[in-house]
């Protein structure tokens, strides 16, 4: 049984991951340095936390469930103490992409991140439909990157990913650089920004006297069908001539001509530096 150490077990993400790890095939050591975090882990899942040094001695896999801004400092402290061949799992590409992980050739760096449950799904239970983040009851995809280490370590890293993010429907292998284009590039810089604009647009309509419920119902319903057509969920789906004309005139008013520069490598790099 693989010995896995979860660092940050009492934090927001650590508590999420523990939900799946407590019933897994891994022999888990829960690591939390703060007393409040230790108490939170105990109350949430009944687990007792150990010190970092206790975990490092035995760990074959180390999962860093700590904020992006803290990964560099945490990794700098623990990586030199790990046994050769140990796998270090990061839950986001930001810190690895920004070179915040210590150089050490005899350990493995594996990066994994959830896609989160998709808008279009076939969840059959109330729990699944309510699990917007994933890791509880809704199926989701995961993306993984073997940043460094022997090729045979990929399967172990993917096993960890499928456990902590379960239930997992699909698993995708990418590079760390490609993962950075997915997040923050695609998911945050583009998607989150445009969703904020959509919410602001809804608020503008509400100012005209349309009720909140009406505007929200109208917008989310149209997001459903428009999204189904745009993202190939409806085979052969097409917009009306009026809708296409609205897009033709609306998009230039909303988007700069050079907006795709957000995917330039230097822009992605700058975005990651800002958040780490």
Question: Could you tell me what each predicted segment is?
Answer:
Residues 52, 56-100:
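Rossmann-fold NAD(P) dinucleotide-binding segment
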Residues 91-183:
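Rossmann-fold dinucleotide-binding core
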Residues 1-45:
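NAD(P)+-binding Rossmann beta1-loop-alpha1 motif at the extreme N-terminus of oxidoreductases
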Residues 206, 210-276:
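NAD(P)-dependent Rossmann-like dehydrogenase/reductase catalytic/cofactor-binding core
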Residues 46-52:
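Conserved SAM-binding strand-loop segment of SAM-dependent methyltransferases
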């Amino acid at each position: 049984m693989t010995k896995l150490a979860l660092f940050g077990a009492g934090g927001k993400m650590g508590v999420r991951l523990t939900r799946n790890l407590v019933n897994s095939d891994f022999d888990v050591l829960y690591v939390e340095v703060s007393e409040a975090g230790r108490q939170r882990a105990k109350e949430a899942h009944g687990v007792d936390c150990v010190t970092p040094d206790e975990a490092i001695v035995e760990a074959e896999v180390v999962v860093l469930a700590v904020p992006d801004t803290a990964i560099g400092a945490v990794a700098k402290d623990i990586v030199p103490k790990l046994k050769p061949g140990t796998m270090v799992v990061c839950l986001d590409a930001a810190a690895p992409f920004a070179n915040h992980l210590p150089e050490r050739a005899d350990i493995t760096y594996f990066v994994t991140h959830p896609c989160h449950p998709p808008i279009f799904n076939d969840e059959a239970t109330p729990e699944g439909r309510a699990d917007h983040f994933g890791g509880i009851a809704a199926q989701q995809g995961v993306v993984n990157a073997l940043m460094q280490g022997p090729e045979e370590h990929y399967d172990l890293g993917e096993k960890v990913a499928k456990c902590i993010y379960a239930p997992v429907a699909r698993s995708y292998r990418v590079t760390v650089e490609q993962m950075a284009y997915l997040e923050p590039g695609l998911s945050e810089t583009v998607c989150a920004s445009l969703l904020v604009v959509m919410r602001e647009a809804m608020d503008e309509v509400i100012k005209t006297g349309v009720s909140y419920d009406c505007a929200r119902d109208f917008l989310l319903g149209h997001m459903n069908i428009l999204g189904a057509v745009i993202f190939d969920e409806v085979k052969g789906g097409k917009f009306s001539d009026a809708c296409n004309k609205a897009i033709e005139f609306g998009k230039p008013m909303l988007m700069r001509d050079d907006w795709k520069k957000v995917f330039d490598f230097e822009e992605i790099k700058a975005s990651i530096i800002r958040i780490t």
